[in-house]
């Protein structure tokens, strides 16, 4: 564990970092994962969380973590530099196809219609993974608990009414950081088989970041071996945090070193090296 007295004087100096016990990897079959967790959660405000995200951390509810797996560096934190981003042909088509969607931004809040869409999405896209059985309480802990500057965005299709109201197509949770937007989680209508809601959502976030004059959209972790993560490599240029530095990735050539050597070279925010 990293103790507060071991960190330089900074807003991060009150945080502690510890490694979890091993657990089955959610993304790569047969792999064992560990996480490095930043605590206590009540001290992690938006400014501190921005620095943690720059160092490869993410959050799930109020739980802030980064991968800390023995001998594996498959999870690469990635972000899109919005001013340099150039959509490809498929992305331009997705943007045009879903131009009828109307986005409404609001504080995090529970809505029964959102939860119903979440459960439909999990049952269709992640059946058997556990999240398809999430209770309302689990849903709220995962997506609606935050101590930082977070927003909920719902996307409705005004051209396709449902039961007399505009159809809910997608919901996205987004964190607003000091240097960008961080995509927390997005779920959408799984019955629209020809839709490109996920792609459209990232394009929408890129446009929002530009309008807010924020340089990046953080997309979480990209895993080359995971088909579920493949879509992130379609956004160019894509920057990844490798050996403690953000650099433009060539997704076909990324070859990462073992985690122990890499984390030894990758300092925690404030200049302190990662420890166990």
From Swiss-Prot:
GO terms for cellular component: cytoplasm. Its EC number is 2.3.2.29. GO terms for biological process: ubiquitin-dependent protein catabolic process via the N-end rule pathway. The keyword Cytoplasm applies. It is an enzyme of class 2 (transferase). The keyword Acyltransferase applies. Transmembrane segments: none annotated. It catalyses: N-terminal L-glutamyl-[protein] + L-leucyl-tRNA(Leu) = N-terminal L-leucyl-L-glutamyl-[protein] + tRNA(Leu) + H(+); N-terminal L-aspartyl-[protein] + L-leucyl-tRNA(Leu) = N-terminal L-leucyl-L-aspartyl-[protein] + tRNA(Leu) + H(+). It comes from the Bacteria. Pfam families: ATE_C (PF04377), ATE_N (PF04376). This is Aspartate/glutamate leucyltransferase. The lineage of its organism: Bacteria, Pseudomonadati, Pseudomonadota, Betaproteobacteria, Burkholderiales. The gene is bpt.
């Amino acid at each position: 564990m990293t103790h507060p007295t071991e960190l330089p004087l900074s807003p991060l100096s009150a945080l502690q970092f510890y490694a979890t016990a091993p657990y089955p990897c959610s993304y790569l079959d047969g792999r064992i994962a560990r996480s490095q967790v930043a605590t206590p959660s009540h001290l992690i405000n938006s400014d501190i969380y921005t620095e943690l995200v720059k160092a490869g951390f993410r959050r799930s509810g109020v739980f802030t973590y980064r991968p800390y797996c023995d001998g594996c560096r498959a999870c690469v934190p990635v972000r899109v530099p919005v001013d340099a981003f150039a959509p490809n042909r498929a992305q331009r088509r997705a943007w045009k196809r879903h131009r009828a969607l109307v986005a409404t931004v609001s504080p995090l809040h529970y809505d029964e219609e959102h939860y119903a869409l979440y459960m439909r999405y999990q049952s269709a896209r992640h059946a058997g993974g556990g999240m398809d059985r999430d209770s309302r309480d689990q849903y709220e802990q995962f997506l609606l608990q935050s101590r930082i500057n977070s927003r909920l965005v719902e996307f409705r299709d005004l051209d396709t009414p449902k039961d007399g109201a505009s159809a809910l197509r997608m919901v996205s949770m987004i964190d607003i950081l000091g240097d960008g937007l961080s995509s927390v989680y997005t779920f959408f209508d799984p019955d629209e088989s020809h839709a490109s809601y996920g792609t459209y959502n990232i394009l929408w976030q890129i446009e929002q970041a530009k309008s807010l004059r924020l340089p990046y959209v953080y997309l979480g972790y990209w895993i080359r071996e995971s088909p579920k993560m493949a879509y992130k490599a379609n956004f160019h240029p894509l920057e990844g945090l490798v050996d403690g530095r953000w650099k433009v990735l060539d997704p076909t050539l990324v070859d990462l070193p073992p985690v122990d050597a890499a984390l030894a070279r990758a300092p925690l925010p404030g200049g302190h090296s990662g420890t166990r």
